[in-house]
Amino acid sequence: LRLVGSEMCIRDRFIINDNVKLAKEIDADGVHVGQSDMEALDVRAQLGEDKIIGVSARTVEQALLAEKHGADYLGVGAVFQTGTKTDAREVEHSVLKEICTKVDIPVVAIGGITQDNVKELSGSGINGVAVISAIFAQKDIETATAKLKSCVEQMV
């Protein structure tokens, strides 16, 4: 299992969520931080220029500030109601689209995305999606992943 994990981390980028210290300790490829976590500017100072920094944003102002402070990509959401983060408020699709037009870094939509609703994000300008339940809550994870990937590839 350790060998498989090591090979996967060499082949694929490994981003730690919300834990800059851990990302630094294990030399992860990067870290994703939320608005209540450390500022992107401070994360960049700790991890260096070669690491990937993602920042959650719900508003155009947050997105622009994250980009200015060195974020490499944005996670914007929740774009739909989600059971994974019950306290998450939905980001209007018009705000998502505006964020996509205002920043020059990739925007990843997150929150409540399923194979059934992902096409509603078409034309928003997103570069990808992040999901949990759309894959892991399914009986056949491999098939669910392939179907969702196909839907996303058709739109972005």
Where are these regions (language model features)?
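Single conserved hydrophobic/aromatic residue that forms the stacking wall/gate
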Residues: L1-G5, C9-I10
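Catalytic cores of alpha/beta
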Residues: F14-D29, V43, R58-G70, K102-V103, ...
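Structural detector of well-ordered beta-strand residues that form the stable sheet scaffold
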Residues: I15, H32, I52-G54, G75, ...
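Structural motif corresponding to alpha-helix initiation and N-cap regions
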Residues: N17, D37-A40, T59-V60, E90-H93, ...
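Glycine/Thr-rich beta-alpha phosphate-binding loop at enzyme active sites
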Residues: I26-V33, S56-T101, D140, A144
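Glycine-rich phosphate-binding active-site loops on the catalytic face of alpha/beta enzymes
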Residues: Q35-D42, G75-D87, S122-L148
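Short acidic, glycine/proline-enriched helix-loop-strand junctions
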Residues: E49-K51, I105, V156
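Expand to "…catalyze enediolate/carbanion chemistry for C-C bond making/breaking, isomerization
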Residues: E142-T143, Q154-V156
